[in-house]
Amino acid sequence: MRIEAIATGKNPPEDVNVIIEVPIGGEPIKYEMDKEAGTLFVDRFLHTSMRYPGNYGFVPHTLSGDGDPIDVLVCNTRALVPGCVINVRPIGVLVMEDNAGQDEKVIAVPSPKLTLRYENVTEYTHLPEITRQQVQHFFEHYKDLEPGKWVKIEGWHDSKYAKKMIVDAIERAKKGK
């Protein structure tokens, strides 16, 4: 995969492209894209028997505060193939702290061009309460059995916060080149 050839999105931060690393409901394995090689590697096997509550990946050509591209959880009902690209709309952010520092997960939904299921979902609060609880529970506990690792949820933020985070990450990536 030539990551450099994949656009950040059609109209960032209103919509962005996400390269999927882990599918919804897949085996409890964390895959991570090696940005230099353009190849998916097994990062680790989750010690818990939990499965990702959405398709998980990153926005190309961004750099978050932790030095990696922005993480995104795409809320939808279909498992996507790792390595594929999906166009999404950011609707919020789950802010966490873990053993490595602050960690933020953008929450997004597929663009209306792909499915009408989420066309009226513009904020994370528009998702069903159970979906928000499942996302938070997953990220709060997916590292529970890994020695020396922990996660603390700090809270949720709206789409405006998510879009600002994306703009800042795009600028940070441009400066880093």
Curated annotation (Swiss-Prot):
Native source species: Mesorhizobium japonicum (strain LMG 29417 / CECT 9101 / MAFF 303099) (Mesorhizobium loti (strain MAFF 303099))
Gene name linked to the record: ppa
Gene Ontology biological-process annotations: phosphate-containing compound metabolic process
Residues annotated as binding Mg(2+) 1: 66, 71, 103
Organism classification: Bacteria, Pseudomonadati, Pseudomonadota, Alphaproteobacteria, Hyphomicrobiales
Domain of life: Bacteria
Role played: Catalyzes the hydrolysis of inorganic pyrophosphate (PPi) forming two phosphate ions.
Enzyme class: hydrolase
Transmembrane segments: none
Cofactor or coenzyme needed: Mg(2+)
Reaction(s) this enzyme catalyzes, per UniProt: diphosphate + H2O = 2 phosphate + H(+)
Name the record gives this protein: Inorganic pyrophosphatase
